[in-house]
Curated annotation (Swiss-Prot):
InterPro entries: CDK, Kinase-like_dom_sf, Prot_kinase_dom, Protein_kinase_ATP_BS, Ser/Thr_kinase_AS. This is Cell division control protein 2 homolog 1. The gene is CRK1. SMART domains: S_TKc (SM00220). GO terms for cellular component: mitochondrial outer membrane; mitochondrion; nucleus. It is an enzyme of class 2 (transferase). GO terms for molecular function: ATP binding; cyclin-dependent protein serine/threonine kinase activity; protein serine kinase activity; protein serine/threonine kinase activity. The keyword Nucleotide-binding applies. The modification Phosphoserine is found at S15. Pfam families: Pkinase. ATP binds at I11, G12, E13, G14, S15, Y16, G17, V18, V19, K34. Probably involved in the control of the cell cycle.
Amino acid sequence: MGSRYERLQKIGEGSYGVVFRARDVTTGTIVAVKRIRLEKEEEGVPCTAIREISILKELRHENIVRLLDVCHSEKRLTLVFECMEMDLKKYMDHVGGDLDAGTIQEFMRSLLSGVRFCHERNVLHRDLKPPNLLISREKELKLADFGLGRAFGIPVKKFTQEVVTLWYRSPDVLLGSTQYGTPVDIWSVGCIFAEMAIGAPLFTGKNDADQLLRIFQFLGTPNRQVWPSMDTYPNSSNMLSRPEFQQTLAATCEEQFQTNPAYAKLGPQGIDLLRWLLRYEPSERLTAAQALEHPYFSVEF
């Protein structure tokens, strides 16, 4: 880890390395050290790590975890980040999944502020989920784990489809879309918003088809009016011709919004915002900037 950082304890394992809490011996500051093993030296640094480094060096914002230092040796790459108390998933577990209305609103404002900052700089996060949102001791929420993040230019490049943990994946990506932009992050934000209210993930599919079916059960089976581009994706005909997608499912969300007391925490404005984040048609989802202007953020809880 180098003589500058004194290892304290292991706090997690990411997609390509181990994360430790450590002390910067020169300043006494507690930091998070992500150590990335370079399995085959001739291959050098994993491209996912290079991507994360280049993105994070550019992104300086109060709602994005700060990359403080990069140490590179032949066999190891070490990224030093500001240390956060816990991730949103652990935080929700810690409070029994029961976040109060004011905390949900504050976390949503922070989440959308971080996402807006990324999107304005042509960066997609592409893996937004509670374990990748870190909470400080002062209850500030910050975006982390940009391993899948990628700058997007115009024209939109074709991306790999395997992004965003299944439960937070948008219906267009589930149908094989590889040409997408900011709306893929916005769908994930909507899923996280609902999860903070109800204390559990909104859509817990076992595979792509099951995930899509759960979305249809909640929002109702879409038609071409609701989702004009639904037939244009690579897997549309294959997926939507399956027997389980032949029946038209009525939306259960309206009943849940009325009867599930957990949603009452969001209030009518919060439920309206959630509807705009979870739109089938990607171009109809609010942008992060538009979402921050939503009346929900003027409500005092």
